[in-house]
Amino acid sequence: MSARTKARKRALDLLFSADVRQISLAHALAVEAERAANEPAREASWLYAREIVDGVIDNQEEIDEQIETYAQGWTLARMPAVDRAILRIGVWELLFNDQVPDGVAISEAVEAATVLSTDDSAGFVNGLLAKIAQNKPRDGEVDR
């Protein structure tokens, strides 16, 4: 498992935990930072996990708006918590992290959904993220 895949899993754990426990992402991140300080072997995954969670915190309104726009017939509240977390990471990587190719972001999210969620979740995640990737503004393009 690559360092980035481990980081995505770590970020997913943080997003899911904060959602289910109904605590702020900032608090969950602070607790994890304290834990990470004592685990130098996991530093590489921690750095990208933190970048993901910080990115979701900074852009959550737009991320959630994108999810709600393309999740035909589904509200965020109706989705399983693990799917919300997977989608938030995927949308952040698609829209706010130019270092991750769209196909990689989608593939990683689908794999997480396959392993961690319901039988239907992988297809749902794939379809939703593919629509967002297809409709996102490209370099030099004005927001729609």
Curated annotation (Swiss-Prot):
InterPro entries from the UniProt entry: NusB-like_sf, NusB_fam, NusB_RsmB_TIM44
Gene Ontology cellular component terms for the protein in this record: cytosol
Keyword Metal-binding: no
Similarity section: Belongs to the NusB family.
Domain of life: Bacteria
UniProt-listed HAMAP family: NusB
UniProt keyword annotations, A-Z: RNA-binding, Transcription, Transcription antitermination, Transcription regulation
GO terms, biological process: DNA-templated transcription termination; transcription antitermination
Name of this chain's protein: Transcription antitermination protein NusB
Role of this protein: Involved in transcription antitermination. Required for transcription of ribosomal RNA (rRNA) genes. Binds specifically to the boxA antiterminator sequence of the ribosomal RNA (rrn) operons.
GO MF annotation, one: RNA binding
Pfam families given in the database record: NusB
